[in-house]
Curated annotation (Swiss-Prot):
Keyword tRNA processing: yes
Gene Ontology CC: chloroplast
Cross-referenced HAMAP family: MatK
Higher taxonomy: Eukaryota, Viridiplantae, Streptophyta, Embryophyta, Tracheophyta
Similarity comment: family membership: Belongs to the intron maturase 2 family. MatK subfamily.
InterPro entries for this protein: Domain_X, Maturase_MatK, Maturase_MatK_N
Name recorded for this polypeptide: Maturase K
Signal sequence interval, chain numbering: none
This protein's encoding gene: matK
Organism of this sequence: Ginkgo biloba (Ginkgo)
Subcellular location: Plastid, Chloroplast
GO function terms (MF aspect): RNA binding
Keyword Nucleotidyltransferase: no
Annotated GO biological process: mRNA processing; RNA splicing; tRNA processing
Superkingdom assignment: Eukaryota
Amino acid sequence: MDKFKRDGEEYISYQRRFLYPLLFQEDLYAIAYDHYFNRSSCFEPMENSSSNDRFSFLTVKRLISRIHQQNDLIISFLNCDQNPFVGHNSSFYSELVLEGPTVVLEVPFLMRSKHSLEKKNEWKSFRSIHSIFSFMEDKFPHPNSISDMRIPHSIHSEIFIRTFRRWVRDAPSLHLSRSVLHEHRNSSENLYKSILIAPEGNTKFFLFLWNYYAYECESLLVPLRKRSSHSRLLSYGAFLEQIHSYRKIEHIVIFSRRNLAKSIWSLKDSSISYVRYGERSIMALKGAHSSVRRWRYYLSIFWRCYFHFWSQPYRIRIDELSNNCSSFLGYFLGVRMNTSVVRIKMLDDLFITDLITNEFDSIAPIIPLIGLLAKERFCDISGRPISKLAWTGLKDDDILDRFDRICRNIIDYYSGSFNKDGSYRMKYILRLPCAKTLACRHKSTIRVVWEEFGSELFTKSFPKEGELISPFFSKTCSQRKRIWHSDILRINLPANFWQNKRNRQIETLFGL
């Protein structure tokens, strides 16, 4: 494919028109098998693997021949209950066949991404969960409102095909994708005849659909064409992993195509900071309340016209920071006033005044954290500690290690919040459950456990207040600065928990 990079037109023509023959190459399914095996091995222990999951290229070759004869055969193949061809291991091969078209569809997507990144990109973009902390540390001169959005994830299957046709001109590949999507739509589980996609998709195919769909949803924030925008030229760089993203746009004026004279959106004085985790996204806006409401109208019109569905009102909510806070991934986001003493000397006079500035701040919620510990049976709803009876059969070191990991996860996750007392309060709540669990294991009392293990018990398991993992920062510095720990394995777990909890609250509130 490198030879087609010399000529742009010929290169684009190749990547759009000749994808379907790749479906019948055995090497493609070898790559798909490697992707499937690597992903499965990360979540499944070795003792659960079976010899029945062995891969057979002969079976794949027969499937390729059948797909080559008629595309409709993939529909009967994807139905594992009615497909005796591959035997008892049909589920394994059905997922593998979905991996193959995904690898093919990723070819133009990767080329499109690389072609966009070769251009000058003036955006500051980050693609990991740590971009959320950069968002919380960002400087907002005058943040007035926060728009809490939830990206719709119920899309008609034909909408994906129509969006694919804009950059994939290979008709057989589109027909094959349509067959797969329509078969999924017509299954008994999808009563509304739509495709439910989410960032935590269990297959590579639906994860690719989410990445592409998120890219299309976020493209509305960018002035893609000069005729529809009048601003400093910003090139939009496509990215493959779109589970997490961070965008910041400044000084945008958006024009309507119908009537430029009357439909000018006065957003040139607004500053937008955008962050997304999964299907939830946050935009911090400044400006008048009417200007902020126009953004919600803009998003609703875009979803209705581009994806052909009505956006529910609960998916876009605007909170004014001056009145209340907004919750995102277990943090309360609000504005905190920072007062600075300024001395002004003019000739012989010295004036002292207070300079008040607003800072965008994150707060650790105390009551939800207590509710989280109560759900895991570490305390009751009032915060009174109780013993973990299920762990009494473990060794002392295992019990201490489990409590240590839980405490470390909470402290690391809220290490950069303004009120660090909330995370340290969770530490003291976990002290007594640890002691009670050890007391139940040894059939003694908490006093006996304390005398036996001594004060080193909690000193070893729990860090002291103000203690940092990194030795490069002093204790005085940690009290003044907010330091985010970058252990992504520990951070992702609380983030996913708060994300799912927030989604359930919204669905319960609106009777979904």
